[in-house]
């Protein structure tokens, strides 16, 4: 079905999924696609460290591509320090420097396999609470992010990582009031301090951390104004309507949309989703 939709589209489509391994396995959890679920990054590391992680990534990419998917919303490059932390089981659990090394090699491997990677969750979850169920506030100083959380993202950016997903954590050292996904300053840090020129996307705007902060459709408008190129939402209809309305009312400058579209098209070209003949200038 995805192949049919891809062939019917004038401009190639991005089809993405979360296939991290462990607790987040949107595809391999179904027996029709794989006999067993992909194991968590930490389980794979214990089996064979980095070589095993890269081989596991290749298997994931092969499976996803076989059913028409071209983006995996992975890897999780957060650096929690406590095994009790919400994000710990989804992370490598190996500290900032090792996570940075793994991230670099994994991004390169996914690119070689023509699978779009998405590093997450910028600016770093740390040991914070689950934003699926409420607002998480990070009180750590900015210097901590510079010496720990940012390292894997920097490593992945240097390796050519095409996408970064931004969390809904409120990080007080960057923005005291807004979730990171809706914060202009957090996006400024990503663009200017980390020199990232690729695609920036939100975590799901239907998550409770956002819903308890701002009304449904308004979240998407704030996300665009903050600097996101792509928006993820399991409740996308009202989000889309509010964005269109904001453009019509001049709340969102068309230039913002155009810049995002150019980045998305550039990535699609780089990953063979479209070729330049498909684009009318």
What label would you give each PLM region?
Residues 37-43, 82-89, 130-136, 242-246:
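A short small-residue
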Residues 23, 29, 34, 40, ...:
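Glycine-rich, flexible loop/turn motifs
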Residues 32-47, 93:
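A charged helix-plus-loop insertion that forms the helical arch/lid used to bind
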Residues 248-276:
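Mid-to-C-terminal alpha-helical segments outside catalytic/metal-binding sites
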Residues 76-81, 122-127, 274-281:
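Flexible hinge/switch segments at interdomain interfaces of large molecular machines
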Residues 2-36, 56-79, 99-124:
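Glycine-rich, aromatic-flanked loop segments that form ligand/cofactor-binding clefts
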Residues 1-7, 94, 98-245, 253-256, ...:
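Second-shell residues forming the walls of enzyme active-site clefts
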Residues 45-61, 97-101, 143-147:
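Glycine-rich anion/phosphate-binding loops
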């Amino acid at each position: 079905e995805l192949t049919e939709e891809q062939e019917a589209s004038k401009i190639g489509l991005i089809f993405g999924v979360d296939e991290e391994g462990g607790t987040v396995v949107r595809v391999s959890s179904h027996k029709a696609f794989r006999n067993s679920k992909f194991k968590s990054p930490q389980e794979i590391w214990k089996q064979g460290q980095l070589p095993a992680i890269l081989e596991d990534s290749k298997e994931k990419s092969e499976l996803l591509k076989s059913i028409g998917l071209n983006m995996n919303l992975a890897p999780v490059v957060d650096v929690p320090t406590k095994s009790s932390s919400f994000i710990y089981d989804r992370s490598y659990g190996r500290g900032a420097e090792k996570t940075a090394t793994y991230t670099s090699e994994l991004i390169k491997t996914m690119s070689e396999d023509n699978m779009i990677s998405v590093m997450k969750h910028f600016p770093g979850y740390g040991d914070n609470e689950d934003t699926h169920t409420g607002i998480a506030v990070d009180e750590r100083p900015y210097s901590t992010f510079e010496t720990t959380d940012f390292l894997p993202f920097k490593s992945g950016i240097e390796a050519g990582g095409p996408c970064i997903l931004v969390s809904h954590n409120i990080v007080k050292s960057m923005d005291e009031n807004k979730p990171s996904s809706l914060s202009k300053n957090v996006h400024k840090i990503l663009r200017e301090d980390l020199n990232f020129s690729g695609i920036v996307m939100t975590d799901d705007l239907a998550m409770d951390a956002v819903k308890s902060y701002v009304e449904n459709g308004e979240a998407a408008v704030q996300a665009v104004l903050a600097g996101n190129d792509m928006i993820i939402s399991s409740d996308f209809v009202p989000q889309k309507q509010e964005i269109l309305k904001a453009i019509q009312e001049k709340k969102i400058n068309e230039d913002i949309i155009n810049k995002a579209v150019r980045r998305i098209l550039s990535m699609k070209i780089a990953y063979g989703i479209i070729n330049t003949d498909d684009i009318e200038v």
